[in-house]
A protein has these predicted regions:
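Acidic, divalent-metal-binding catalytic cores of TOPRIM
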Residues: 1-148
Length: 148
C-alpha cells in the first residue's frame, strides 16, 4: 500500500466542526478515507475536548495546538524561532521580530497570503530544518499510517 500523502483536500472552518465531522462520518462509513483535523486551542478547553473525542474513531485524528494558535506552536517548536526569524526577515522584509512572541504576534496579524507563501516554501532550502509542531506531525503520521 502506498502511504504517500498525495490526495488531500484541505478545508478551513471557523465554527461548526462537530456537525461537519458527523456528516463526514456518515458519508465515509465503510470507506478507507481518513479525516485529519488540526485546530487552534484558542483558550477553549471545552471545545478542545469536544473535538478530540472524535479520536475514538479509527479514521479520524483531531489534534489541537499547545499554545493559542498554530503560529505560536510553529515559532516555539524546537529551534524554529531562529529559522523563521531569518525566513521572515529575508522573504517578507519583516522587522522587530527579535523574540518568539513578537514573531508569532506579527505572523498572526499577517494576511492569509503570508501563511500560503510559508506553506509553499516549507519544502525550500530556507525552511528545510523546520520542525512541524507535534500536533501537526501527529495528524500527518495518522494520515500516512493510521492510528498508532
Amino acid at each position: 500500500k502506498d502511504n504517500s500523502l498525495n490526495n488531500i483536500e484541505v478545508l478551513s472552518f471557523h465554527k461548526g466542526f462537530k456537525s461537519i465531522i458527523e456528516i463526514w462520518l456518515k458519508i465515509n462509513k465503510g470507506t478507507g478515507n481518513k479525516l485529519g483535523i488540526i485546530r487552534d486551542f484558542d483558550n477553549e478547553e471545552k471545545s478542545k475536548s469536544d473535538h478530540e473525542r472524535y479520536n475514538q474513531y479509527k479514521n479520524i485524528q483531531v489534534a489541537t495546538t499547545k499554545k493559542y494558535t498554530l503560529e505560536d506552536d510553529f515559532v516555539n517548536e524546537e529551534n524554529n524561532f531562529e529559522i523563521l526569524k531569518d525566513y521572515f526577515e529575508k522573504e517578507h522584509n519583516w522587522v522587530d521580530i527579535d523574540t518568539p512572541d513578537k514573531l508569532s504576534d506579527k505572523w498572526k496579524k499577517a494576511k492569509a497570503q503570508t501563511m500560503y507563501d510559508f506553506c509553499m516554501d516549507l519544502s525550500s532550502d530556507a525552511l528545510k530544518e523546520i520542525k512541524l509542531p507535534k500536533h501537526i506531525q501527529d495528524v500527518m503520521d495518522f494520515m500516512q499510517n493510521g492510528k498508532v
